[in-house]
Amino acid sequence: MRGAHYVAIVLLVAAGGQTAAGFDQDEPQHAPDNGYMASVDLRNEFLQSRALQASRNPKDDLMFSAGDEERTPLARSNYLKKVTIPDSIINTANAMRMEGKQVRL
């Protein structure tokens, strides 16, 4: 049985090697017209440019340009939020999990 696993792994590695050898990386990457980058090397730069925020300088009220922006990490509150679930839903889920037996927490 071990021999079959080794043969299967060798075949998968060989097939992957042929697929990688057949992939031509010299083809030009065309960027779509909607502003998204197609090149893997530019992906980080693109994502960082989308996270720019306006300068906190009060003199820069209405003057926004690339020079007036600074890179800041997103606040945790924007993507981590505590979800409150009503007790009735929790009790119903516990009852379904326990096959109808009422369980109080």
From Swiss-Prot:
Q: What is this protein called?
A: Secreted RxLR effector protein 158
This protein's major location comes to secreted
Where does it localize? Secreted; Host nucleus; Host cytoplasm
Q: What function does this protein fulfil?
A: Secreted effector that partially suppresses the host cell death induced by cell death-inducing proteins.
Locus of motif RxLR-dEER: 50-71
Whose protein is this, by species? Plasmopara viticola
Q: Which gene is the coding source of this polypeptide chain?
A: RXLR158
In the UniProt record, the signal sequence range is 1-22
Name the UniProt key words of this record, in alphabetical order. Host cytoplasm, Host nucleus, Secreted, Signal, Virulence
Q: What is known of its domains?
A: The RxLR-dEER motif acts to carry the protein into the host cell cytoplasm through binding to cell surface phosphatidylinositol-3-phosphate.
Sorted alphabetically, the Gene Ontology cellular component annotations on this record are: extracellular region; host cell cytoplasm; host cell nucleus
